[in-house]
Amino acid sequence: MTISALELISYYTKFLSMLSQDEINKKLEEWPKHYDPKGIELKWQNIWMTKEFWEKVFRFRDEDEKSPVFVIDTPPPFTSGELHMGHAYWVTISDTIGRFKRLEGYNVLLPQGWDTQGLPTELKVQYKLKVPKENRELFLKKCIEWTEDMIKSMRTAMIRLGYRAEWERFEYRTYESKYRRIIQKSLIDMHKMGLVEMREGPVYWCPKCETALAQSEVGYKEEDGVLAYILFPFVDGEGGVTIATTRPELLGATQAVAVNPDDERYKSLVGRKVKIPLFDKEISIIADKAVEMTFGTGAVMISTYGDPQDIRWQLTYRLPVYEVVDDKGKIKNTNGLLDGLTVKEARKKIIEILKEKGYLIKVEKITHNVLAHTERSDCLSPIEFLIKKQIYIKVLEWRNKLLEDYKKMKFTPQRMSYYLEEWIKNLEWDWNISRQRVYGTPLPFWYCDNGHLIPAPEEVLPIDPSKVNPPVEKCPHCGLDLKPVKDVADVWVDSSVTVLYLTGFYDDKSRFTKTFPSSLRLQGTDIIRTWLFYTYYRTLALAGNIPFKEVLINGQVLGPDGTRMSKSKGNVVSPLDKVDEYGADAIRLTLLDAKIGDDFPFKWDTVKSKKLLLQKLWNAGRLSYPFIGKKKINKPSKLHEIDKWILQEHKKFVQQSIEAYRNYDFYIVVESIYSYFWETIADEYLELIKHRLFMEDESAIYTLSRIIKDLLILLYPIAPHITEEMYERLYGDKMSIALENLPDTSDLEDDGEAQKLGEYIKKATSAIRTLKIQNRLAIPTPISVKIYGPDDFIAKIKIIEEDLKKTLKLIDIIYQENNEIKVELLSDHGS
């Protein structure tokens, strides 16, 4: 074999241009060998919070008339002080979307609010700080102090996870004057529309919290109970009707006995009179289709009120109302029989008395669903139905409009729209917004005894009616005296105006025009019937349009055992437990490695594997640094065949990742990084080009620089800390990777031959590595091999034969055509 003079000159030139090992080692010393997530993350979190970065990267630009706008209506968490894994999940989603949309060229508004008011804080101040509610001013002062302490703790935790909201201008608290003004203005506007009124009637009442509730705040929970069979004697003769009830303590409030008209057992009894045992009161037997013939005896007592069905029957048949339960859940108005006892105590005692008097037929122990205050996990107490004068927002008359317009919002996953639709369809009551608490937004009205509401003048908002005189002395409707409404608003009244607040509906028409409807609502499944529904309804009523174009509903983060996290189970995991050990980026990768809308278990072993992925990325950056670090690299006139192949793989990765981000399929991005970076770049491509990097081959250096940069940009939204650090070290073209554009692969035409070469490379390298392992040879051991395969396979492998030899330490390769691809070890492999 002869070598031409031209080839010798070319080889000598390349030899002279090779980096020496000393030069490479010196460069490598500039790049730490071990990935230090804590150090890197704290560094960048501090940098991101600087004024310069806020202004150039994270600020929503009001003056920008060219860029498309993306507004994220993020959840304002209740200020408990503890950032749990559910918070960490949506914080990661919000931040990831915000960072991606900036790369995509959007002017992003990423706010963060705090749901500050409500019962849990009151209970902390009342019982932990020992501040009495009666001292209203001091109590409210301590509530706010407690709230601010909790916000500080939660904000610090959010920032530690890499969350960069626009704290400078779009952090809000629902107790603040500027936010309260909007809450109160929205209520006054709805009053003008005839949608807010005071009325008296049965309400959901929580005796533990001593406040009225809305339908959305209650639900059923399973409890042990009793089913008491009680004899109601006939008034006009012997015998009687035996009813079955789970609420015998409400016997004194019974207004009728009901049976099903189709029940043959009772058809002849409809209309007859019976006596209420122990209370010597006569009531009638009535017939109603709602009575379940298979429940108990098929005969039930109608009390005021044991459950929602009792309310329906009382209204339908205009039955009298008699209350036997007070605000604290204690029995009253039973002529001393049960007065002063709790509901459970009264239930036990009346069963004993009925048995003693001969009215108790039998008692069964049962497990049944009880209506409870389920919206607050720290309560979960059974609720009662009490007669109260409350303020309501009319909802039911909007049902048809709500069922139509929700379809204008795009849901991810689409199946989540079903839950909103079903909630709207099954609404039974208007929204009771009165709460008998202290720490909340004052309802901006005065009222008279006839129930007329007089709103506060808008120019004095926010206002506490209990502290100032009404705008008029007498009710303009009836002339009666006016009294301040002392109740505060349901906290969902507060949070249902987040979109109106952020988009400037009341105070910034320019921003409102630009940002409404907002781009995205992000939230969990558990608040579809509260935050989502109330925001949707109130925005539709007040602004005449849907509040957001898209709704993203995330699933629930479960404990490592796959069940709901619970302190009693001991499976609660805090995101901050090991954030310093594994890093926020690894936690974020773990949280986003599940399909949006699905529940998934959180395991630290998974986080550990994500850290290994980031260590692998860090190693790749370190390997690349001596060859591409901060260098001006131009595209060569001709690309090596291996580089052509990897750019085809790269094109698929880039396009797939961008599409996945746009569809909120973050798990696809995470999976793609594993399959593309780890399995293809790190395990195959980098090994194949090392020898060319040492020769400073233009094609290898250009290709490596391009794919690493694009990879960092596409990983940045999910893992922003390590990508900022590596970008700064390797490129630093801009002050932040956030200011880069999304990768563009439009210059890469589809190349089927290059893709086929890549498949053949993987098969050949895998077969040769397997051969060495089977023969107990170390990978660096030089060997000679015989490669079998079809014509096309052999032809393409010959193109990159020298690369295979250098990468896999092959002395010689002999080829033989064969239908099957396989590799044999030649006997003189070590010679």
UniProtKB/Swiss-Prot annotation:
Q: Which reaction does it catalyse?
A: tRNA(Val) + L-valine + ATP = L-valyl-tRNA(Val) + AMP + diphosphate
Report the residue ranges where the short sequence motif 'KMSKS' region is annotated in this entry. 564-568
Main localization category: cytoplasm
Which Gene Ontology cellular component annotation is one that this UniProt entry carries?
Answer: cytosol
UniProt KW keywords = Aminoacyl-tRNA synthetase, ATP-binding, Cytoplasm, Ligase, Nucleotide-binding, Protein biosynthesis
Q: Where in the cell is it found?
A: Cytoplasm
Q: Which GO terms describe its molecular function?
A: aminoacyl-tRNA deacylase activity; ATP binding; valine-tRNA ligase activity
Chain positions recorded as ATP binding sites: 567
Q: Pfam families given for it?
A: Anticodon_1, tRNA-synt_1
The EC number(s) this enzyme carries? 6.1.1.9
CDD domains attached here? Anticodon_Ia_Val (cd07962), ValRS_core (cd00817)
Q: Name one GO biological process term.
A: valyl-tRNA aminoacylation
Location of motif 'HIGH' region in this chain is 77-87
PANTHER family reported for this sequence: VALINE--TRNA LIGASE, CHLOROPLASTIC_MITOCHONDRIAL 2 (PTHR11946:SF93), VALYL-TRNA SYNTHETASES (PTHR11946)
Q: What function does this protein fulfil?
A: Catalyzes the attachment of valine to tRNA(Val). As ValRS can inadvertently accommodate and process structurally similar amino acids such as threonine, to avoid such errors, it has a 'posttransfer' editing activity that hydrolyzes mischarged Thr-tRNA(Val) in a tRNA-dependent manner.
Q: What is known of its domains?
A: ValRS has two distinct active sites: one for aminoacylation and one for editing. The misactivated threonine is translocated from the active site to the editing site.
Give the family this protein belongs to, as stated in its UniProt record. Answer: Belongs to the class-I aminoacyl-tRNA synthetase family. ValS type 2 subfamily.
Its protein name is Valine--tRNA ligase
